[in-house]
Amino acid sequence: MPGHLQEGFGCVVTNRFDQLFDDESDPFEVLKAAENKKKEAGGGGVGGPGAKSAAQAAAQTNSNAAGKQLRKESQKDRKNPLPPNVGVVDKKEETQPPVALKKEGIRRVGRRPDQQLQGEGKIIDRRPERRPPRERRFEKPLEEKGEGGEFSVDRPIIDRPIRGRGGLGRGRGGRGRGMGRGDGFDSRGKREFDRHSGSDRSSFSHYSGLKHEDKRGGSGSHNWGTVKDELTESPKYIQKQISYNCSDLDQSNVTEETPEGEEHPVADTENKENEVEEVKEEGPKEMTLDEWKAIQNKDRAKVEFNIRKPNEGADGQWKKGFVLHKSKSEEAHAEDSVMDHHFRKPANDITSQLEINFGDLGRPGRGGRGGRGGRGRGGRPNRGSRTDKSSASAPDVDDPEAFPALA
């Protein structure tokens, strides 16, 4: 009916790829099932009906375990796969039926737990088991070592553990860091807390009797001075030095006063101590400004200038000399000669006949600017026309007759 809207409509659509997405099973399980079928076919030909039933049971357990493991595998395990040296079960071992050993009469040995996991298709580590660490054997205790702290070198090199990469620290073949030295002692007898230097003075200080020094005696790199430097800075040491210096001065004065044949009287130590205390009790010496200036003037070196006296070192042959003055007549004659020389005129000179008036001359050159025309039309007038227009005099601005329109 015209004008009536159709309420519903449809069209037939056939999608050839619609059935591909219907399967919700895991593709790994499908592949595993295909492999199990091949195993069953191979096992039936070799071992008979008993072997076939055992193969079916093993295949069923394998498929179930693989399905569970694949379902439980998290996204984190997929992002961080195992290293390549960790292998998966070889295909030869998978395809080989487990019952084939019975036919040949060989007794089957029970599997270890890792081999059982291997049969179930689980990823395992194919590396051999780690050996237990060797026992550390020491030839002698520390007390029995020789004098001077020297360690014995009689032990062969083979017994020593491998140091560095691949050592006993983290198993064979791995990136080990050698044997740990956290206990402060290894098989070769080195001590962790010893200081090592170029001369080995500090490392064997406990055995050789050398004293350990915190400072290097003022030599070498990283020099911190000597131990005596701190003693010299102490106040007790300074007091002792002052007392020694005072005693030396007293003895030197006594030796100068006494003749050579006489013996020197021995000074008592108590008197020396009293003198040192008196020197300390005096304190700083005070003086006035005038006294201080007098002392400074005495110590100051006087500067002497070698000033030449008048007529010192004069030559006697010039004593009769006198000053010569020019006469006035010679000067007047010289002036006349100079004037004649500069103002002499030639016979054909006509400069005196010329009359030059600077005020009457008009402005030559540019002249009138007429003849330009309108804006944009025509240019400047020719150079030749300027000479004609320059002859016409300019009108007088003050003359009212020159401008009749303004009157």
Swiss-Prot record:
Name the residue ranges with Low complexity bias.
Answer: 51-68
Q: What are the Basic and acidic residues biased-composition ranges?
A: 70-80, 89-114, 122-162, 183-199, 261-274, 281-291, 327-341
A Gene Ontology biological process term: negative regulation of translation
Disulphide-bonded residues = none
Under the heading SMART domains, the entry gives: HABP4_PAI-RBP1
Query: Region labeled Disordered — which residues?
Result: 33-227, 242-291, 327-407
Q: Cross-link (Glycyl lysine isopeptide (Lys-Gly) (interchain with G-Cter in SUMO2)) at which positions?
A: 102, 211, 228, 280
Modification after translation is described as:
Phosphorylation by MTOR inhibits SERBP1 and relieves ribosome hibernation.
Subunit structure, interactors included: Associates with mature 80S ribosomes. Interacts with EEF2/eEF2; interaction sequesters EEF2/eEF2 at the A-site of the ribosome, thereby blocking the interaction sites of the mRNA-tRNA complex, promoting ribosome stabilization and hibernation. Interacts with SPIN1. Interacts with CHD3 and TDRD3. Interacts with ZDHHC17 (via ANK repeats).
The name this protein carries in UniProt is SERPINE1 mRNA-binding protein 1
